[in-house]
Amino acid sequence: MQREFVSGAGLGLRRALLEPLGAGDGVRVDFLEVAPENWIGIGGRLGRQFRELTERLPFLCHGLSLNLGGYAPLDMSLLRAIKGFIEQHDIRAYSEHLSACADDGQLYDLMPLPFSDESVRRVAERVRVVQDVLERPLIVENVSAYARLPGELEEVDFVRAVLEEADCQLLLDVNNVYVNACNFGFDAHAYIAAMPSRRIAYLHMAGHDEQGASLKIDTHGAPVCDPVWELLAHAYACHGERPTLLERDFNLPPLSELYAETDRIRELQRRSGEAQLRSLGYGT
């Protein structure tokens, strides 16, 4: 039986965080997220520590290698392994990137897709296959990019079309919207507002690297910047408060600094909830 979804503020789990999160009784996040490829088959001490956390907190999976946008056949053995991992650890939901990451072999990067009607149909068909195998909805994530491939659609229209054609949900990565808006010159606020509220499952927040005024690189290696915090508040204003997760992949600070950012997420969620109540005529 599929469990209820997560709520509140979450954190991406990295191996360096296993011991800090496992120490003591208080974990100050509401849920955690892992890349299943990094944890499938892990045993020993790390496996035991991971299992202890999955028994204490709700978990989400965020995949890296499924190659939803590629032309190579889907890796069914990987997909079956992910399904087993999800069932073993009572994972609440599984998401993947709207990108290509393999050809004859793994590319170890998330490559952009052509924003075309043909690409919409192909990706949607692969999403439906994944959902059939997993026997659960798939959540797809908008990705950062540094080049554009030929296509007749804008990014926002491509993402919306995939969601409708595949009948799937969205992981709205707010930092990726900001990075792409800076890199390609579109309106980040309009992009977020255009996403279909009923499709948004949860949100991602992260930091990025500044490569001059016109190039941003999504690194997950820095604190979230003020413009991205403002976009998160805008997302809540447009779509209501949603579960939101902080990603930090390297340059890991003390856990207290990560908690300060997840606390800021909670504060924005609280303000969004209060604003919604006021709009309905409750409160002052």
Swiss-Prot record:
Q: Which Gene3D superfamilies would you find in this protein's record?
A: Divalent-metal-dependent TIM barrel enzymes (3.20.20.150)
Which family, according to UniProt?
Belongs to the UPF0276 family.
NCBIfam families assigned to the protein according to its UniProt record, in alphabetical order: PRK05409.1
Looking up PANTHER family in the UniProt record yields: UPF0276 PROTEIN HI_1600
Name under which the protein is recorded: UPF0276 protein PA3283
Q: Name its species.
A: Pseudomonas aeruginosa (strain ATCC 15692 / DSM 22644 / CIP 104116 / JCM 14847 / LMG 12228 / 1C / PRS 101 / PAO1)
